[in-house]
Amino acid sequence: MDDNKRPLYLPFAGPAILEAPLINKGSAFTEEERIFFNLEGLLPHVIETIEEQASRAYDQYKNFSNDLDKHIYLRNIQDTNETLYYRLVQNHITEMMPIIYTPTVGMACERFSKDYRRNRGLFISYANKDRIDDILNNSTRQKVKIIVVTDGERILGLGDQGIGGMGIPIGKLSLYTSCGGISPAYTLPVTLDVGTDNPHLLEDPMYMGMRSPRIGGEEYKEFVEAFMQAVNRRWPDALIQFEDFAQKNAMPLLERYKDQYCCFNDDIQGTAAVTVGSLLAACKAAKSKLSEQRITFLGAGSAGCGIAEAIVAQMVSEGISEAQARKQVFMVDRWGMLQSNMPNLLPFQQKLAQQCDDLTNWDNFSDNISLLDVVNNAKPTVLIGVSGAPGLFTEEIIKAMHSHCPRPIVFPLSNPTSRVEATPKDILHWTQGKALVATGSPFEPVVIDDTTYEIAQCNNSYIFPGIGLGVLASGAKRVSDAMLMASSRALAECSPLAIDGEGSLLPKLEDIHLVSKRIAFAVARVAIEEGHALPTTKELLTYAIEDNFWTAEYRSYKRTAF
């Protein structure tokens, strides 16, 4: 029997039920439940359906005039009645995703301490480093299967937000549920409070985190190690997603733990997977291969390099050598294009630096090759922005790219909207509507000469919920590169533009449940093939995915002995 249809036996009654967001039904408690659980008189007389509740909640939602207030309102529903919250969000997913996650969640993180209302998740401070096991045991969620953890140091494009970064794990897990069907009872947001280097927070009397500079070095490594070991003791089968760690920690933590635990870094691997999936869809629409493209990145941090490495892997899978694939990828950061003779390149940047001997025929060859120089010399067909710096895809650069590429692929992916390298409207106007555009944050459709262009949001929410569902359904013990590549290919197969020759580059968010299930199946199949999960048939795997897919419906309650 579907878990949603089984009665749930509860050992408590009265107001305590109304204070438990995973259990509370509000006005939807039946007459029998109100009697058995001592709720008579605590609720208005009328018994409502969840759709009636959602209709009222949506009317209230529309009365708020700004996005931050809407975010706070939705979070209040989440903290009082999670089933209603997810029914409401799922009914209006396209409208509400930018409110519960990017870009609005960035403002919520900045105001986290000022707007704090109710506890959610776990805050593990360095001061309590010797009591992490006890803290995990204090969690209100007992059967945790997915954890999203941050240390708040690199929140979107906003930098160090300290414990305010908790808004990101909360938002991400909301998408695991609303997009990927993961029961909210299985999710846990965690913030590692290691201090902050943000002077505004240190001086803010309302800041609720540790008011001390961030720890680093061996102290930091030992603290994260203690956390990972404690989680493995408490929930050995849980999937751990690293979120918004600073560049200096993100890649080292991923490299350290990816072969020890079931974990991944969404900023590096999730962003890479959705970008590769979007590129594969764009290439299909243009009737070409990814291995035929010349790709330029603006931004050579851990996220940009993670995307680049995933692109190289996909190119190699299409039949070209790794050396040739790397020659077709050009990384530009604040110091110019990465070159092999540059000092102080980070380990993950070194493999993506262009060999100086290959650049001697370039115009303006120097130690500092600008983005425009790269566009004019390398003649890229794909331009990807992960710089976090607004306006750097200028009209001159886009037009220079378009002059040698009839249908350029341009992905300004930086979040939030205020950090985007160029707006879709500008890119499409500068290319007379020829560019294939996807962005990291949501944008309205663009109209040029009576033609409407839907702007695909190259958002990780297309990928990570499906990965989580696939891991849960298969029981996978690791998240491998091949599993991530499978998620990219599955996403590309869902592209309306690639399939039908028209429409958006990525599926509509209204279809996200179907997309997540398709990705989950692809991810789980590879997990089984690689030995990360036990063998099963396609039919049983499909059943497991459906069985693990939670829907926002109320269960009936029965009272058990105290």
Curated annotation (Swiss-Prot):
GO process terms (BP): malate metabolic process
Residues of the site described as Important for activity: 267
Keywords: Metal-binding, NAD, Oxidoreductase
One of the record's GO molecular function terms: NAD binding
Keyword Metal-binding among UniProt keywords: yes
GO cellular component: cytosol
Species: Shewanella halifaxensis (strain HAW-EB4)
Subunit comment: Homotetramer.
Binding sites annotated in the UniProt record for a divalent metal cation: 243-244, 267
Record family assignment: Belongs to the malic enzymes family.
Cofactor list: Mg(2+); Mn(2+)
Listed name of the protein: NAD-dependent malic enzyme
Keyword Transmembrane (UniProt): no
Record text on cofactor binding: Divalent metal cations. Prefers magnesium or manganese.
E.C. number(s) listed in UniProt: 1.1.1.38
Organism taxonomic ancestry: Bacteria, Pseudomonadati, Pseudomonadota, Gammaproteobacteria, Alteromonadales
InterPro entries: Aminoacid_DH-like_N_sf, Malic_enzyme_CS, Malic_N_dom, Malic_N_dom_sf, Malic_NAD-bd, Malic_OxRdtase, NAD(P)-bd_dom_sf, NAD_malic_enz_proteobac
Active-site residue list: 101, 172
Reactions performed catalytically: (S)-malate + NAD(+) = pyruvate + CO2 + NADH; oxaloacetate + H(+) = pyruvate + CO2
Chain positions recorded as NAD(+) binding sites: 154, 267, 415
